Amino acid sequence: MGTRDNESMGLTRRGFLTGALALGAVGAGSMLAGCSSEGGAGAPASDERAWDQETDVVVVGTGFAGLAAAHEAAKAGSQVVLVEKAPEKYAGGNSRACAQAIWSPEKTAEGVAYFKEITGDYHLVGLDDAVIEAYIGGAKENADWLLDEFEIETKTHNACEYPAAKTASAVGDSNTLIPAEGLGNARVWAPMFEVVGSESGVTSLFETAFTDLVFNEAGEAIGIEAQQGESPLLIKAKKGVVLACGGFEYNEEMKANNCRYPSLAWGTPYNTGDALTACRKYDIDFWHMNSATPATRVGVQATWLDDDFSECGFDCEVAGDAGYVWTDKYGKRFMDETRSYQHGYGRDALFYNDSAKMEWPRLPFWQVVDESTLPFMGTSGSGWVHIVGGTSAPDSTEELLSSGLMVKADTVEELASQMGVEATILQESVDALSGPDDEFGRAAEKKRALSGTLYAVQLQPIMVNTNGGPKRDASARIVHTDGTPVERLFSAGELGSVWAWYYQGAGNVSECMVFGR
C-alpha cells in the first residue's frame, strides 16, 4: 500500500469548500449545506465506530474529477484523504489515458441548447435543466481554472462532433480546449496529479479499494469502508464523501446487464464499478446506465501483454493512410470506413445483428491492410495501453501475428484462406479500394489500392467509458430515488455522468472538472 501524507491530519479546519470560487456554477448554497461542519455534529452515539483514520473530506479516485475535488477542498482549508484503488504508478483512471481535450463552450445558453439537442427528448427525461446549466455554465471557467490553479496553458479548438445539429453553429468556433503543447501524453492530468499530491492537507492512499459507504442514523454519509490488501480500513469523513472513481468498463457482468453492445475497454482496468456496487445497497437513484461510448476506437484485446494490461483494448485503427478496408466475419465490406466516428455513434453499422442467424456478423470484423499501412495503425496517442503501457500497434506486429489476432499472406486468395472466408467475397471487398465509385460513399481520395504483402487483423469495438451510475443534482449531490439529496455524499465525472445518449468529445473531461470542483 502506498501513502502520500503531506501534512499530519488536523481535526479543526475551515468548512469544506467555503469559497465561492470553489463552488463556481454548481450551487454554492446547497453544496455548503451538504458539507457544513455542523452536518455530523449531532450524530447519535450508535454512530461511534473504531475509525482507522479521520479527516474532513474523503475523495475516491485520482482522475480529473477526484483531483479537482481534492484540490478545492484542500484550498479551502479542509483535510482530505484521497483514496485510489490502483498503485501510484497506475493512478489517474481514464483521465490519464484520454486525449486531454476539454469541451468548454464559451456561450452557456447556446451550449445548453446543443447539449439538449444531441441528447434528445427521450434521454432528457429525468435530466433537470439545472444540472445541464450548472455543467455548461461551469465549463466556460475551465481554461482560467487550469491556468490559475495548475499553470496549465490551453488553446481553443473547434471540435463540434455533430455539425448537423441545428444548434451546432451557435456553440462557436472555440468550443474545446486542448493543451498548448498538444493532445495526449497526460499533459493535463500529470501536472494536476503532481500539484494535488504535494498539497498541504492532502493524504493520498494508493492500493486502497473503496468498498462501501458509511452512514449515520440521520442518513448522512460519514465515511467509507476500504480495503488495503488483506486489511479493511474505516475512514471517517467529518464533512463529506466525494465519489469520483469512474464506471464499469471492466466489469463484464455489469456491461452485459446494461450495455447493449459487446465491446472491449480502452481505459484503466481498475474501473470495475465499485461505487455502483456500493450505492446499490442504499436508497440511491441511478441514471444513464445504458449510456456508453460504444466504438470510439477499434482494436484487439492485448492478451500478449502482462496482467496489468492483458484485459485492455489495444487500438489498431488506421489513421492517416487510405490503404485499408473493413469486412464482416465473412469477408464482405459493409460501410464507409472513413466516416466520422462520433465517439462510436457514427459506427452503428458495426452493431448490426442478424436475427435470422442469431449472430453479430460484424463482431468481430476484419481490417485488411498492406505493409505500408502498418505504421498508421493504432496511432491515436491515447488509451491505457499506449499512454501507461508505452506500446502501440506499429510496435507490435509480431505480437499480433504470433497471438493469432493477425494473419498475413502474399495474395488475396491466400489471405482469405487464413481468415476463413471465401476468396471471391474478399477480393470484391479489396477491389473496392481501386475504383472511383463506392457502394458506401467512401471518397476516392480516401482510398488507396493495396499491394504487396497483405495483413488482416480481427477487430472489436473499444469503448472509452460507461456513463451510468448514481444520479446527481446541480450541486453534485447524489440523490435518493425521491430526488432529495443524500446528505454529504457527492459525485463527479464518469460515475453517474450527465451524458445520456450522443456524446460530444471531451465532454466527460469537462464535467469531471466542473462537478469535481
Language model regions located:
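N-terminal secretory signal peptides
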Residues: 1-12, 22-30
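Beta1/beta-strand and adjacent pyrophosphate-binding region of the FAD-binding site
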Residues: 51-63
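Core beta-strand elements of the Rossmann-like FAD/NAD(P) dinucleotide-binding domain
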Residues: 53-55, 231-240
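Glycine-rich FAD pyrophosphate-binding loop
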Residues: 78-94
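Conserved redox-cofactor binding core of oxidoreductases
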Residues: 137-232, 252, 299, 435-451
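Glycine-rich loop(s) and the adjacent beta-strand/alpha-helix scaffold that form part
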Residues: 236-302, 509, 515
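An anion/pyrophosphate-binding glycine-rich loop and adjacent beta-alpha core
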Residues: 276-278, 285-418
